[in-house]
UniProtKB/Swiss-Prot annotation:
CDD domains: ATP-synt_F1_beta_C (cd18110), ATP-synt_F1_beta_N (cd18115), F1-ATPase_beta_CD (cd01133). GO terms for cellular component: plasma membrane; proton-transporting ATP synthase complex. F-type ATPases have 2 components, CF(1) - the catalytic core - and CF(0) - the membrane proton channel. CF(1) has five subunits: alpha(3), beta(3), gamma(1), delta(1), epsilon(1). CF(0) has three main subunits: a(1), b(2) and c(9-12). The alpha and beta chains form an alternating ring which encloses part of the gamma chain. CF(1) is attached to CF(0) by a central stalk formed by the gamma and epsilon chains, while a peripheral stalk is formed by the delta and b chains. It is an enzyme of class 7 (translocase). InterPro entries: AAA+_ATPase, ATP-synt_VA_C, ATP_synth_F1_bsu, ATPase_a/bsu_AS, ATPase_alpha/beta_chains, ATPase_F1/V1/A1_a/bsu_N, ATPase_F1/V1/A1_a/bsu_N_sf, ATPase_F1/V1/A1_a/bsu_nucl-bd. Belongs to the ATPase alpha/beta chains family. This is ATP synthase subunit beta. It is found in: Cell membrane. NCBIfam families: atpD. It comes from Cutibacterium acnes (strain DSM 16379 / KPA171202) (Propionibacterium acnes). GO terms for molecular function: ATP binding; ATP hydrolysis activity; proton-transporting ATP synthase activity, rotational mechanism. It catalyses: ATP + H2O + 4 H(+)(in) = ADP + phosphate + 5 H(+)(out). Its main location: membrane. Produces ATP from ADP in the presence of a proton gradient across the membrane. The catalytic sites are hosted primarily by the beta subunits.
């Protein structure tokens, strides 16, 4: 599918009219006159009446089943739809608004605004949600690190500009705050835009997110699209494409670096499985759709860097029953460049962002990409933390005093590293009262080198808590000395 622009005037154009012949839940069969059969993925419009009110319903053509009949998936409940109801073929795929008009607003899968009066929104351009990925010649050949200014991310799990990051974490470990912080930093440090796609979001979660983003002052820089948990599977399957299409416009037309959040990518696979079952396809492993890898690839291949500009994606990944071999998360992992795992144990100690430094990974934590000094420092930090983890059982039974002198030093430095990995964030300022900080990667590497070398062994570990660079540690240490 090309990047054809669909103007607001042509989005409701009718190129053919058919009639509903069968409705089974969200699956609708529609018969068209000979020669007017709509193409696969075309959007069809139907008006259904429920309790005296007429509702517009959008269908998407999924199959041609013969005898001038198409099988379509409804993106809204099919209540009120009857046999013989008129169906209008738009002659084009579902299209959504793109551009600055999307920022600060909440949209559904078909591009209807949800948090404002539609008459107050002036949409000048729409793009179809089904588009080809960038041509190979247009891709950015160099791998570049996205410097976030967050120490733990930049040092231990560096993000690729135009890459895909998997975000793992249960409820209450700081996932939403980290998402908001990344949106803030992309807007203020890079002048970029963020798009949030809620795939199968709980209504309460979506509402809380919008309110929190508004309070944090990042809503104005963000376009939000939601296909909620109570909506038909067709909506949940396509909502990620709606968000991605908006992000592609910011990248390709406005030449911005874009941050795309998908929460939750597992529900994208789950919705595809439901649609596949509704269409009568033979299930594959563990009941998933046979085209799982294909559907995932069509989404992920569009998330990339073109020359000079990028879409960087953070995708929340739910792992069913913590089974990493499940086909849905396993298919997602094949596309990820970095994984950021949020730890409940670290969060319980009040250390935020609660990123687990030992289980989080990155493809570019390699001297070839980040440089030898960065790589050596990250490796040394991980070795100290790993040794500290191994010593915890001994400490729990015998106490720190029974350790060798070398191990005592290791534990003391590990505790300073753990404290120094915490950082004051901009969006959490209202909770902590501490202003946010952006730490350049060179300062981050130098700070952790000082801890690993023992240059700051004389400074109490409290001075390292919730700070930015090592300069702030020194300021805290000076205050502590003055206070006696």
């Amino acid at each position: 599918m090309t990047a054809t622009t669909i103007t607001p005037e042509t989005k409701d154009e009718v190129v053919g009219v058919g009639r509903v012949v069968r409705v089974i839940g969200p699956v609708v069969d529609v018969e068209f006159p000979a020669g007017q059969l709509p193409e696969i993925l075309n959007a069809l419009h139907v008006d259904a009446e429920v309790m005296g009110e007429t509702h517009a319903i959008t269908l998407e053509v999924a199959l041609h089943i013969g005898e001038n009949v198409v099988r379509a998936i409804s993106l809204k409940p099919t209540d009120g739809m009857r046999r013989g109801t008129e169906v209008r073929d738009t002659g084009a795929p579902i299209s959504v608004p793109v551009g600055d008009v999307t920022k600060g607003h909440v949209w559904n899968v078909t591009g209807d605004v949800l948090n404002a009066d539609p008459s107050t929104i002036e949409v000048t351009e729409r793009w179809p949600i089904h588009r080809d990925p960038p041509a190979f010649d247009d891709l950015e050949p160099e791998t570049e690190m996205l410097e976030t200014g967050i120490k733990v991310l930049d040092l231990l799990t560096p993000y690729v500009k135009g890459g895909k990051i998997g975000l793992f974490g249960g409820a209450g470990v700081g996932k939403t705050v980290l998402i908001q912080e990344m949106i803030y930093r992309i807007a203020h440090n890079f002048g970029g835009t963020s798009v949030f796609a809620g795939v199968g979001e709980r209504t309460r979660e979506g509402n809380d997110l919008i309110n929190e983003m508004d309070e944090a002052g990042v809503l104005k820089d963000t376009a939000l699209v939601f296909g909620q948990m109570d909506e038909p599977p067709g909506t949940r399957l396509r909502i990620a494409l709606t968000g991605l299409t908006m992000a592609e416009y910011f990248r390709d037309v406005q030449n911005q670096d874009v941050l795309l959040f998908i929460d939750n990518i597992f529900r994208f696979s789950q919705a595809g499985s439901e649609v596949s079952t509704l269409l009568g396809r033979m299930p594959s492993a563990v009941g998933y759709q046979p085209n799982l890898a294909d559907e995932m690839g069509q989404l992920q291949e569009r998330i990339t860097s073109t020359r000079g500009h990028s879409i960087t994606s953070m995708q929340a990944v739910y792992v069913p029953a913590d089974d990493y071999t499940d086909p849905a998360p396993a298919t997602t992992f094949a596309h990820l460049d970095a994984t950021t795992e949020l730890s409940r144990e670290i969060a319980s100690r009040g250390l935020y962002p609660a990123v687990d430094p030992l289980t989080s990974t990155s493809r570019i934590l390699d001297p070839l990409y980040v440089g030898q000094e960065h790589y050596d420092t990250a490796t040394q930090v991980k070795q100290i933390l790993q040794r500290n983890k191994e010593l915890q059982d001994i400490i729990a039974i015998l106490g720190v005093d029974e350790l060798s002198e070398e191990d005592k030093v290791t534990v003391a430095r590990a505790r300073r590293i753990q404290q120094f990995l915490s950082q004051n964030t901009y969006t959490a300022e209202k909770f902590t009262g501490v202003a946010g900080s952006t730490v350049p990667i060179a300062d981050t590497v130098e700070g952790f080198q000082m801890i690993c070398r023992g240059d700051v062994d004389h400074i109490p570990e409290q001075a390292f808590f919730n700070v930015g660079s090592m300069d702030m540690v020194m300021e805290n240490w000076d205050k502590m000395k003055k206070e006696g």
